[in-house]
Amino acid sequence: MVKQERSGRTRGNLIRAASTVFDQVGYERATLLVISELAQVTKGALSFHFAAKSDLARAVQAEACTASGALLAQQAERRGPGFDIAVDMAHTLVRLLETDVVVRAGTRLTQEIDTPDDPSVHCHLNWLGSLYRTLRRARTDGSLLPGVDVRPAATLMMSLITGTSSLTRTHTELAFGKSPFSSRESAEQRLTRMIQLVRPALSGP
């Protein structure tokens, strides 16, 4: 039992270390040596758990989907208007992309390596499915306006999430003629402003 627990901790440390490296330099530039050093394990211990870098990357993707998917599932069980729950889901995902390196690395890897169309490892598919199901509920409970197509509505919400996350690290103030040293909106603040723009078209005033 102790040996299994130690093995589980080592595997978890490797996934977190790999996430940090993938997040910082991407898949191609990441090396197993750097990952093992960051995890403070030997190269042999890394090879015991993951035969190749691709296996480690897939484990990061799976962990990212599991962690984020669990939070979305909890929110989906809440009572209340479906549209409001979908908005809360969007805020949760933006927050995770800001604060959780595993989730951030998992989504980056989806763009950098060949990833199967499987929600257990493809976070964007995982999240889009949750948003779609929640907005279908919103259509049923009346919090989504009649006539709104659920599929593009879910895709729009997903685009707000990914767009907000990608722009957060960009000095967008420069595009608006402001100083790069002016105060920057947080990702959630930016998401709130964008949802305020689209809410009337999706859910009404």
Describe every region a protein language model picked out.
Residues 17-21, 96, 160:
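Short amphipathic alpha-helical elements of helix-turn-helix/winged-helix folds
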Residues 125-141, 159-205:
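C-terminal peripheral helix-coil segments that are non-catalytic and often amphipathic
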